[in-house]
Structure formats: structure tokens, C-alpha cells
Amino acid sequence: MIDAVKVGFVPFSTAPRGTLVVFCDDALKFGRAASKALGASAGVVKRATTTNQFKGKSAATLDILAPEGLKADRLIVVGAGKASALKGSDFLKYGGVLAGKIRGDNGAVTVIAELPSAAMSPDQSASLASGIRLRAYKFDRYKTRKKDGDDTALHANVTIAVADVAAAKKAFAPDNHVVDGIIIARDLVNEPPNVLYPEEFARRASRLRRVGVGIDILDVKAMTKLGMGALLGVGQGSARPSRTVIMRWNGGKKGEPPVAFVGKGVCFDTGGISIKSAGGMEEMKGDMGGAACVVGLMHALAARKAKVNAVGAIGLVENMPDGNAQRPGDIVTSMSGQTIEIINTDAEGRLVLADVLWYVTRKFKPKVMVDLATLTGAIMVALGTEHAGLFSNNDQLSERLTKVGIETGERVWRMPLAPEYDKLIDSQFADMKNTGGRYGGSITAAQLLQRFVDDTPWAHLDIAGTAMGAPKSDINQSWGSGFGVRLLDRLVAEYYETKR
């Protein structure tokens, strides 16, 4: 992971150094602080903005090297479009856009956080800083040689000039911890599977003790004693033993039921005996994207001292095809006592989640529970890579997730759950089977999971299309996106934190 950019805040009166970044609207007007910083170069800049195709449209950029009359070495103008059309999420995007423009810049960068009509608010300035950090991320720790044309990392010292430094720092502090959580999740998803196997994943999750998270790690012996036959069946073909990690953050009122988050952590998925085709199998190192998100989220909640009690639980396995591997036709007994016939060993994630969901439901009795999993290819057929699939037994929780998804840009789309689908996973020999056939694959997977949550308000997010390999964006150029950390942090902040 490369996160070498340093972001700080300074007053408007600070003289710009190195690269100067300013904002203008679609009328090509600048704010007072920007105009003052431009000084004698204002005429040159004005001519450039009027003769170029720039037009000041939202997120458009104009790059001018060493404009006459400007003490800075380089000027970047970022368009903010119409003031009436601005949204809160635009400032995160602008941070990403300008970080993309200064990538490879190893010097000083000064960003004037001002629109033509007014200075950016502390929250807007904080979003700008977050966007810079998120776009600056690069995972290249295993590259020993760099080629010409390789995307270069951002090593600059970025100072954001603001109207109120103290207020901007205060606004950015929690956001900065959320960005750290996203970077943790991205790192985990990007790691190769020979490095990040279940035991190593558990070890990395245990680093959250540093920010005050309580950690319990269940080994195979402990899970066997608990009766986690569904999870253990998935991992029995691997030389790497399975693990379940429980993370606890107690920031709310003592005794108040927690919010709970459960993640699928298949550290590598060959498909098992029902083996996948070779093409693209290397991407199955990312089949633990749900677990990665939960670890990143728990870091964010603890580091920003969220006023909530929260539990994160991740089931960590490898799905491998050796002589001891699970077979189609096997019947496993889950921790709940319900039996599951294995039809396809490549429908393994729901087996892992079934036991962890049941464990969390019974042990912690959460007020709400959300699981995340790169669960089905079917959700990508339905929704592509722009929305995660949302399945829930609770309308209020669904509405809240949809709302914060729009706010954060990590969008979800509600999919159906209904008793009529249950017949698709009926088994002749067990209580259910682990796959329902060709049609409605993401729905039947969620129908199975629903049987392991009792009456807990619960949502299942199928993030197969958004956690890895999703289209690059203004704030993410990484294969592993860290999807879900901002979404769920916002859910907690808006609806479940104690207001004091």
C-alpha cells in the first residue's frame, strides 16, 4: 500500500508553494482568496479559461505550467459548475480529481478551499481532503521494478487553505479515520492469497486492539465445539485452518444491544470439488471482500470513538479441492442445528455466513445486523458493478441503507425476499440445499441466510460487483475498492450512535 500523501490545513493568508489549485464556477469566476493568490497572473489565467474548452464545468480541470506573474510553479483550476447544483458528495470527487492531476508530484501543493460565492465549509473541506487521500492510494508493494508509464504514486505535501483551520481539522478528524478504514479494506482485498490466508487475516484483524477493539479468535477446535459444521465443511479441504474473528467496540451505553456486521472471508475460492474454470480464478483472492470491509469499518468506528456498541464478525476459510474436501452430496449440520445438503461446493460463502450469523444472533442479540459478501455472480448479472444487492427482512433498515448509499455514492438496490422462493432450496434429504439452481441465484442465497438470523432486523449486501474489479472512479483507482466502509460508517453515524 502506498499512502504517502500528507494533507493538512492552513489559513487563506498562507503563501502558496509548488502547485496551486483553485476553483471556479461555470461563469469562470474565482473567489476572493483565489483571486488574491493569482495576483498578477489573473489576466493570463482568464485568457486561458476563456480560450480553452475548460468552461468551468463540474470536475473539469485546466492545467497551466508556470503562468506569468504567479509565484507557484504550476496552476490547476478545477471547475465547480453551477453553485445551485453542488452536492455534498461533489467535494469528495473534487479531491479525487485534483489528486489525479497532481499524481507524481513530489513537491508542495496548496489547495484554496473556496468557491466563488464563499469559502468551503469545514465539512466540504474535510471531504476534499478525504478525496485526495482515497485517490492517492496505490497498492504496489510487490513491484520491484517500475516501468515508464506506470501510474505513479502521490508523495506530495498537500496543504488546504481554509477560512477556519480549527473547524476544518475538527471536521476532518473522523473522516480521516474512515479513510484509514477504507485503506485497510483495500489492502486486505489486494493482498495475494499465499500471503493472506485465514490465520494471517485473523492476525491482521487483531491489530485493531491498538485502537481499542476487543478481539476473540475462534480456532477449529473452538468452532467444532460450537457446532459450526457449515463453516468448517468449507475449509476442510485446505491445509490452512479456518478461523472466525469477533471484534467488539463498546462506545455506547453499557448494556445497550450492539449493531452487528458480519463478513464473508473466503481467502481464496477455487470452487472446491465443483472447481471453477481457470480463466479469472486469480480474482478469487478477493472473495473475502466482505470480511475486509468489516475489519475496515470496525477500525473506523473505534478510531473515531463512535458512540455506539458494535460487533464485527468474520468467517475466514479457504475453499480448496484436496482429498479431504467437501463433496457434492454431503450433508452438514450448522451451528443452528439445521442441516444443509451440498449441491455445489462453489456455493460456499452462504455456508460460512450461516454459522457466523447464527453465532452473532444468539451471543450478542444485536439491534440490527448487516452482512456483506462477494456472494454471487448472479447479482452482477442483475445489477452490474454500480450497485450492491440489498436483501432485508426489515423495511426501515432497507430504507436507511438506501439513503446513506445515495449520500456516500456506495449505492445499493433492494432485491426481493419472499416465501415463494424457499421451495427452490428445498432438499429431499436435508432441511435445505445450498443452491437453488440457475434462476434467482442471488435471491435463493439470501433466502438461505435469512434462516439463520431469527427475527433480528437484518440486511444482506451482495457486493460481488462492487468490492473488487469495479470500474475505476475519481476516488478509487485500486482493484480492491473498500466498498461498504463509508456506507456502513454513515449508517451508524446517522441512525445508531448515541446522541450526547
Curated annotation (Swiss-Prot):
PROSITE patterns: CYTOSOL_AP. CDD domains: Peptidase_M17 (cd00433). One of its GO terms (cellular component) is cytoplasm. Signal peptide: none annotated. The active site is at K276, R350. Its EC number is 3.4.11.1, 3.4.11.10. Mn(2+) 2 binds at K264, D269, D287, E348. Gene3D superfamilies: Leucine Aminopeptidase, subunit E, domain 1, Zn peptidases. Belongs to the peptidase M17 family. This is Probable cytosol aminopeptidase.
